C-alpha cells in the first residue's frame, strides 16, 4: 500500500510538473510553437554533442560519474530512457538526495542509486533524462555545482530546455532551493521536500 501511494504521489507530481510549462513558451519561440507535452518532442536537434550518428546511443543507468566543474569534482549518476537516441528532446529531472547520500568519499559512492527519489523518476511512463548528484554540502558551492551540472546536460544531451525540473530532499532540498533561486530561468518547476 505504501509503495502504491508513493507511486501515485509521484505520478501526480510529474503530471503537475509537465503542466507547469504548458501555458508558457520560451521568448525565442514563435507563437505557433505547440505547448510542451508529456512526451519527448520530435523536433530535430540543433547542433549538439548528442546529435544522431551512425553509432547507437547507450541508454539506461550511468552510475558514479565525475564531472570536473569550476568548484571542483561533481559526483553524479544519470539515466537515459530506452528510446533516447539524440534525435528528439526529452524533459529532464535533476534530483538531489539528502545528507546520508551526499559525497563523503569512495565509501559513499553510488549511495543515491537505490534512493526512491532517483529511481521513481526512471520508472514513470513519461520518458525523461534523470540526473542525481552527490554533492559535498548544501550551501552555495553545491548550488553552483547543481547549476553547472544542469547546464552540462542541457548543452551535451537532447534536453528540452522548457521542461527542466528539479527536486530536492533534506540537504538536497537546501541545495536545489539555492540553485533554483540563483537561476530561476533554468528550471521550469521545483519540488521541495523535507527541508527548510
What residues fall within each predicted segment?
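Active-site machinery of serine-nucleophile hydrolases
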Residues: 92, 96-147
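Sec-dependent N-terminal signal peptides of Gram-positive bacterial secreted proteins and lipoproteins
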Residues: 4-23
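Extracytoplasmic/secreted proteins, especially bacterial periplasmic and envelope-associated proteins
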Residues: 91, 141-152, 174-178, 185-186
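A conserved short beta-strand
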Residues: 185-196
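A domain-start/cap signature at the N-terminus of enzymes
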Residues: 20-90, 167-174, 178-182, 191
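Gly/Ser-rich "nucleophile elbow"/oxyanion-hole loop immediately N-terminal to the catalytic nucleophile
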Residues: 83-84, 138-170
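Active-site catalytic pocket residues across diverse enzymes, especially alpha/beta-hydrolases
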Residues: 157, 183-184
